[in-house]
Amino acid sequence: MPHNSMLKENRLFKPTDEFRRQANISGLETYQALWEFADKDYLTYWSDLARELITWKKPFMHIFDDSEAPFYKWFSDGTLNVSYNCLDRHLPDKADKTALIFESDFGQVQLYTYAKLHNRVCRFANALRELGIKKGDRVIIYLPMLVEAVIAMQACARIGAVHSVVFGGFSASALRDRIEDAEAKLVITANAGLRGGKIIPLKETVDEALEMGCKTIENVIVFHRVNIDTPWKKGRDLWWNELTANQPAFCEPEWMNAEDPLFILYTSGSTGKPKGIVHSTGGYLLGALNSFRNVFDNKPNDIFWCTADVGWITGHSYVCYGPLANGATQVIFEGVPTYPDPGRIWRMIQRHKINVFYTSPTLIRSLTRLGDHIPNKYDLSSLRLLGSVGEPINPSAWMWFYEVVGKSRCPIVDTWWQTETGSIMLAPIPGVTATKPGSCTLPLPGIMAEVLDENGQKCAVEQGGALAIKRPFPSMLRTIWNDPERYKSTYFPAEYGGKYYIAGDNAHRDKDGYFWILGRTDDVLNVSGHRLGTMEIESALVASPKVAEAAVVGKPDEIKGEAIVAFVVLNDFRPEGEEARQLAEELKAWVSNEIGKIARPEDIRFADNLPKTRSGKIMRRLLRSIAKNEMITQDISTLENPQIIGQLQQQWL
């Protein structure tokens, strides 16, 4: 069956004998024993792993504390340092091992050994301390995909500062919101970034954000990436290289309590205000470390490449922390996968002899459209394992990845997890689990996942329901920054008894117990693996002086997974024809400027008003059907203004 016509694929794909023979976990009996042990003696399972995998300054005695549930604590009397676990402990036997292979936008390659990376992290950490940054202070990192982003994150972890990385594609107002919520003291940025041959003026965006408020910011550290004129505020702005030039090459780690915050990462919420997800030091590190080792079957000589930006959780767990804590070698790429030509990504795999390749369904789908002949021109024989992250992967893209890229010999680990979970929750163990295209298969040992109906009962086979995790796990978020009540109501809702972690995704299980993710239950869109709140986009549209009202929904998109459709009511008229097309383009650019290009609507439609019930509630379900060009089958008897349906169906592309 050709890849492009496949809607469902029912075959099971078992790991090859060759892969299974060398896998870290290979026997079904071994895997089942591990799973049963985790199920029966849950706390011993996690405490054994924590003692085996993490280097502790002060070993923990207390494994788990649920006395303030759902604010759970793990290993709470132990002390450690994440940077020490990622760098220092490898120096006795891995000082000269390559930690990072950096490839720039224009193809220049730089290697960083563990010793060199340790040196750079320590120098930068000492510079931060010299500026008065101390344990618990919040630091915003707004950098391109450079080694310096990892250095900045590790340096914060080393001195106990709480970093909050903001994706470099976010706008000044989005950056300001995050700075103000975190009450950060410092911003770390670059004068500009390079992507696809284009210069991205990051420092200008930082300046614009700080002009809007952000009174807590004392300094801005600027890495010189591009030779351009850089706007400068004397007394506040400092050059990275000047700060670090004379710093000592060792920085004593700050020994942190396991429950101290490691970082805040903002993720979109359905109410419009981004949620500051707080991750702990000990539990988060254990999750990233253990999942990297098992899901990616980590080997001492592997070259690993995760294409995620560090502005997202995948870049935290499987670029900055998981690989380095395991002493692995990985690639960091500054540029765009199809620049300067469509073969870039495959040429990099050939050039660096990459063994494990972890990327998003959006990228896979965009590469399939370019044709099989492009990857077939390159030697991809170094690959032994492929991975997918960020959204469900459709079976046709899975099969293309498996057959064309992996030559039907590389297992695919389709992983489900979230910013909030910190590490992978559901995924195949590649030497054991038979895979099904489109399914993230089974929970990892120690993760007790289930699909629940609206009464909190286990769903029947193939019945859709809410994906839940029934027991706390070490890498889960600890709270929402400055909003503990929102944490409780969002993740431990009363309708499920307040005791289960409710992921906000719908799923079902098949007859083999495999999980299939069906999509978001709330008003959060998943665009190219990035979560965007509908309320945030609606707020941006309404901020335009021309817009009176807006409603945003998603529709399926074969490249992005989900595309943004906006229904807009203007202040005084409804445009048609060329005028509507021009206004739609203007509003798309407006949203890009307000939030970032990732939030640019694919389709904007104009109406005299929005479909509302007589109580004034917008009928979003109806809008979703219209966006998908579906026949309207739902009950519209409560619709106050049925005459506008025809207007809402008109596209001005």
UniProtKB/Swiss-Prot annotation:
Name any cofactors this protein relies on.
Mg(2+)
Q: What class of enzyme is it?
A: ligase
Chain positions recorded as CoA binding sites: 195-198, 314, 528
Database matches in InterPro entries = Ac_CoA_lig, ACAS_N, AMP-bd_C, AMP-bd_C_sf, AMP-binding_CS, AMP-dep_synth/lig_dom, ANL_N_sf, Pept_S26A_signal_pept_1_CS
Tell me which residues bind ATP. 390-392, 414-419, 505, 520, 531
Q: Which GO terms describe its biological process?
A: acetyl-CoA biosynthetic process from acetate
EC?
6.2.1.1
Pfam families listed in its UniProt record: ACAS_N, AMP-binding, AMP-binding_C
Catalyses: acetate + ATP + CoA = acetyl-CoA + AMP + diphosphate
Function according to Swiss-Prot or TrEMBL: Catalyzes the conversion of acetate into acetyl-CoA (AcCoA), an essential intermediate at the junction of anabolic and catabolic pathways. AcsA undergoes a two-step reaction. In the first half reaction, AcsA combines acetate with ATP to form acetyl-adenylate (AcAMP) intermediate. In the second half reaction, it can then transfer the acetyl group from AcAMP to the sulfhydryl group of CoA, forming the product AcCoA.
What protein name applies here?
Acetyl-coenzyme A synthetase
Look up and give the organism this protein is from: Pasteurella multocida (strain Pm70)
**Organism classification:** Bacteria, Pseudomonadati, Pseudomonadota, Gammaproteobacteria, Pasteurellales
Q: Which gene is annotated as encoding this protein in its UniProt record? A: acsA
